[in-house]
């Protein structure tokens, strides 16, 4: 498929085009997601009303759906927006937050996957496993490490869902069901900042807005994000998660393609 170092250059394309990323995300992370996308160089919009989501989705470069704080009205808006995005050829990125934690959450994740053509599904191992009816340890909306081969799980999920799957954790995996890429960047402090995973999903959306190959977009996004986290931790990690969060937003804005190429650690499986 090519050298991942070349895919890192998508960062410049994102910053050059400033794609509009339409987020229907959860109330806990809205501000952090918007600020993170702005730091990256994308243009965020948070539109939830079912009366306007179809129109907004068609205007966007990507649509991001996140079920972190779902309710019936929001789910209806997601389905309307997703169908409109599919009609317009706009990539849809899905974050099945907490799939497996409750039956309603799991059923909603399945419903979205069945009714909308998804470009990328980004979640932790438990969420992805529950998306395809497999068991994995989960606690609330955050998963433990669980057990099993995450690469194999990701490939099964990609094949079953018909989409690119990105599983994030201590190591990140991106696959289309055939080739798989492991990204070894990141930092544990990301788990101490509410919305870090949700923002990552939206960052994948920004990269998918400028690159039709969803594997390339996801690998480039996750590598960039992980490098930014490592730089932020080196700068402010000892002061704690509050300082890290600020430093992380700064790093998202500061780092360039050369940083990603130099510090990225990507392995093909």
Swiss-Prot record:
Domain of life: Bacteria
Annotated residues for binding of substrate: 46, 195
Pathway(s) served: Cofactor biosynthesis; thiamine diphosphate biosynthesis; 4-methyl-5-(2-phosphoethyl)-thiazole from 5-(2-hydroxyethyl)-4-methylthiazole: step 1/1
Keyword Zinc annotated: no
GO molecular function, one term: ATP binding
Protein EC: 2.7.1.50
BP GO terms, sorted: thiamine biosynthetic process; thiamine diphosphate biosynthetic process
Coiled coil regions, renumbered to chain: none
Pfam families documented for this protein: HK
Binding of ATP, residues: 122, 168
Enzyme class: transferase
Cofactor(s) listed: Mg(2+)
Catalytic activity: 5-(2-hydroxyethyl)-4-methylthiazole + ATP = 4-methyl-5-(2-phosphooxyethyl)-thiazole + ADP + H(+)
Alphabetically ordered keywords of this record: ATP-binding, Kinase, Magnesium, Metal-binding, Nucleotide-binding, Thiamine biosynthesis, Transferase
Function: Catalyzes the phosphorylation of the hydroxyl group of 4-methyl-5-beta-hydroxyethylthiazole (THZ).
Family named by the database record: Belongs to the Thz kinase family.
Protein name: Hydroxyethylthiazole kinase
Species annotation: Geobacillus thermodenitrificans (strain NG80-2)
């Amino acid at each position: 498929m090519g050298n991942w170092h070349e895919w890192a250059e998508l960062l410049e394309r994102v910053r050059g085009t400033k794609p509009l990323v339409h987020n229907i995300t959860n109330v806990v992370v809205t501000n952090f997601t918007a600020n993170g996308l702005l730091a990256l160089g994308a243009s965020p919009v948070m539109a939830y009303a079912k009366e306007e989501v179809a129109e907004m989705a068609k205007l966007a470069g990507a649509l991001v759906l996140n079920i972190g704080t779902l309710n019936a009205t929001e789910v209806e808006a997601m389905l309307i927006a997703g169908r409109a995005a599919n009609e317009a050829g706009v990539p849809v990125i899905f974050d099945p937050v907490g799939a497996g934690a409750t039956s309603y959450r799991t059923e909603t994740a399945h419903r979205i996957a069945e009714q909308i053509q998804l470009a990328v599904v980004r979640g932790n191992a438990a969420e992805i496993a529950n998306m395809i009816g497999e068991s994995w340890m989960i606690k609330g909306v955050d998963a433990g490490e669980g057990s099993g081969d995450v690469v194999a799980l990701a490939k099964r999920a990609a094949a079953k869902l018909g989409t690119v799957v990105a599983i994030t954790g201590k190591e990140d995996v991106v696959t289309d069901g055939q080739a798989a890429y492991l990204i070894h960047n990141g930092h544990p402090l990301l788990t101490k900042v509410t919305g870090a995973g949700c923002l990552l999903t939206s960052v994948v959306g920004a990269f998918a807005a400028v690159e039709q190959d969803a594997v390339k977009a996801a690998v480039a996004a996750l590598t960039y994000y992980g490098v930014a986290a490592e730089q932020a931790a080196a700068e402010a990690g000892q002061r704690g998660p509050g300082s890290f969060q600020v430093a992380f937003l700064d790093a998202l804005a500061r780092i360039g393609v050369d940083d990603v190429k130099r510090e990225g650690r990507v392995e093909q499986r």
